[in-house]
Amino acid sequence: MIEHYGNGPFAFQGFPTPLFADIIRINCFRQRATKSLPIIETEDLTYEAYEILNRIQSFSSEQWAESKLPSRREEWTLLGNIRQAAVALYCIHSLQSISVLPLIPFLRESCFLHSQQLQRLLKRAIPLPSLRLFMLWPLVVLGVEAVNGDLSMQAFVQEKLSELSRYTGMLAPLTAKDVLERFWNSGRTDWDSCFERPYAFIMVPAVDVSKLS
């Protein structure tokens, strides 16, 4: 699927193909880990999970943007950096939630650094009409990280989700805001406690990104 559609104008909601592939791998891991697995197989999953995380963190947005028009390359690089930070946070949080990745200080520090970078990048991207529609999922991921006591980050996520709803006239950002606020007040911190059922946090069914390329 990725090889067939990855270079098309509707390319996975603006996701760099390698990062989108890693999201698919993470979701497959989550499905496998929900089954009763022998300890040795669980250890293998942990090793593979670290490989995925290392690959995400080694992704180069600058190289990805090189194939784009020079006039839009800076925006593509910004989008790639946002996706990279959000996917790294998703990888850690969602795999810790099912005990594939451990709850250790090193990964907590990684989440802190990725979230700080993601917040800085979102401040730059959300005002840009060409990137705005791609920002809902990264904001949701940042909101999950904000459960760890960062009230200023929670306020930022609330504000920007409300802005997205006003900019677009869509309800999805407000739905995300409600979900996150319930999570922040729940006393829980794991990824799966945030989402009691599946949600599709996208702004539109398919965004034509051909005018950015």
Residue map of PLM features:
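Cytosolic regulatory protein-protein interaction regions
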Residues: M1-R166
